[in-house]
Amino acid sequence: MLATELAVTHPELVRRILLMGIPYYDAEGRQERFDRLGQVKPWPDSFAAVAQDWIFAVEMRNEKVSLERAFGNYLESAGAWQGKARIYGAVFQYPAEERAPLLTQPTLVLNPHGNLKEPSRAYAELIDGATLIELPDLKYGIFDAAPEVLASHARPFLNQR
């Protein structure tokens, strides 16, 4: 959504937009997520508090993502524990329905089939003329697991004149 806002407010700087893994939800869905995730949480005092981060980063990792890389992702997530509320707050308070339709640049949405599959599809529908490419074989860890697949779609799109 940061790319959307930059493109809308500074169209002279943004020639094309490539989006992927978009956490877009309708107003009710955003409010529910903001209420749940937008408040600073106290530092965890048990593993149970961070278990979901571990499951996502390590246990659900793509088979092509090394344990070392997955563990690093987990540590990064844990280190940002209290900062996550500000990130989620910005994402879930962003007026996407108002801003996305203002995009005038060619837009490509790559859609891996992880947990943001449906939200990404819905966001693409807000953008007039957006191209949506489904990537059903990709789910998580896509930058590590399939950079060549992403590049095979991104390069031709970004290199167009």
Role assignments for model-derived ranges:
Residues 20-74, 79-89:
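Helix-rich cap/lid subdomain of alpha/beta-hydrolase
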Residues 28-33, 121, 145-146:
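Short aromatic-enriched loop/helix-cap "lid" or pocket-rim segments at secondary-structure transitions
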Residues 81-99, 113-118:
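Active-site nucleophile elbow and catalytic-triad environment of alpha/beta-hydrolase enzymes
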Residues 106-145:
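Conserved loop-alpha-helix segment in the C-terminal half of the alpha/beta-hydrolase fold
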